Design a protein with these regions (language model features):
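Gly/Pro/Ser/Thr-rich low-complexity, intrinsically disordered segments predominantly at protein N-termini
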Residues: 1-148
Length: 148
């Protein structure tokens, strides 16, 4: 449900703009180089929500290189992976903005890439509207993400 709300709000905002939103399953090949074949890339991730603003990164197998925005919804089984492993992968790959969405605590942490490292940018909970920093004037209504 959180994914559907996030994708819906982003889709409505991005309508007619150059960026595109993709829900999971959408494959991202983080460290692919120009000369690599897609099947040779070993760092594959499938974020819950992905926003790509550079159409040249898109092909029929997904996204080649770092997307602009990634949102991950925590679950008990993925919590450590999303907060540590993926956090570090996305940071190293150059994903400009990373949202960690916790449906248990009904909260969102927003990290923004600053000089190659993520800096905690924002925190929000039910009733808040959080700014998507890489998209001008884009706000996500968390009361729609975490309905009562």
């Amino acid at each position: 449900r959180a994914v559907a709300s996030l994708v819906g709000q982003l889709y409505a905002y991005l309508n007619g703009k150059k960026c595109e939103v993709y829900p999971s399953p959408f494959t991202v090949r983080l460290f692919e180089q120009e000369e690599d074949r897609p099947e040779d890339v070993d760092t594959l991730v499938e974020p819950d929500v992905t926003v790509v603003c550079d159409p040249s990164k898109l092909d029929n197998t997904g996204c080649k290189g770092a997307p602009d925005l990634v949102m991950e919804i925590l679950s008990p089984s993925t919590q450590r992976h999303d907060k540590l492993t993926k956090f570090n992968l996305y940071q190293r790959a150059g994903v400009r903005e990373y949202w960690i969405v916790d449906t248990d605590s009904k909260s969102v942490q927003v990290f923004l890439l600053d000089d190659g490292r993520y800096a905690a940018k924002d925190f929000g909970t039910v009733g808040d509207k959080l700014k998507v920093n890489i998209l001008e004037n884009c706000l996500i209504d968390l009361s729609q993400v975490f309905p009562n």
